[in-house]
Structure formats: structure tokens, C-alpha cells
Design a protein with these regions (language model features):
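Cysteine-centric segments in proteins
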Residues: 1-91
Length: 91
């Protein structure tokens, strides 16, 4: 059985005074923490390989560009705002 192409991760974020959510680091499924060097862009987008829709953050981690997605929760009765995920790299 192949692992899911969508990898949910824990993300350390801060909010600007304008209300923008900015990720600072993420914890990969193996427990390793990666600092986010820079956020290049934020835009609504879908994850092509993993599926899902949300905000796509184009980030730089260790000099490499990656897409980090924030998937909004549409269940307004739930206290969870949403979840972060990355698309697993193809083997």
C-alpha cells in the first residue's frame, strides 16, 4: 500500500498585525523540524497530486522551493480552523 500523497504537518505560525498568517517552521512526519527561510507567495490553489483546496504558500526550506497548503475547515461547528499539509514527493 502506498502512503497518502497528502502529508499533514504541524506548523509554527505567527500573525501579522494586518492579520496575515505566516508559517515559520514545520515538523515533518518523521519528527524533524524544518525552518521556513521565506514565504515567496500566498494564493488560493488546489493540490494537484494530493487533492484538496486551500491557500498555497510557496515557501523556501533549506534553499528549496516547496508548496505548503492550508486546508480550511468548512464545518463551522468545529473549533478547528484548518490543517496544514504538503504533497509527498513522487518516488
Amino acid at each position: 500500500m502506498q502512503p497518502s500523497p497528502k502529508v499533514y504537518v504541524e506548523v509554527n505560525v505567527y500573525f501579522t498585525k494586518e492579520g496575515q498568517m505566516r508559517p515559520r517552521s514545520l515538523i515533518w512526519e518523521d519528527g524533524i523540524t524544518y525552518g521556513i527561510d521565506r514565504v515567496k507567495a500566498i494564493r488560493p490553489a488546489h493540490a494537484e497530486r494530493a487533492g484538496g483546496l486551500g491557500d498555497r504558500y510557496t515557501i523556501i526550506v533549506n534553499g528549496r522551493e516547496r508548496y505548503l497548503f492550508f486546508e480550511h475547515n468548512t464545518d463551522f461547528g468545529n473549533q478547528t480552523v484548518g490543517r496544514w499539509f504538503l504533497e509527498r514527493r513522487e518516488q
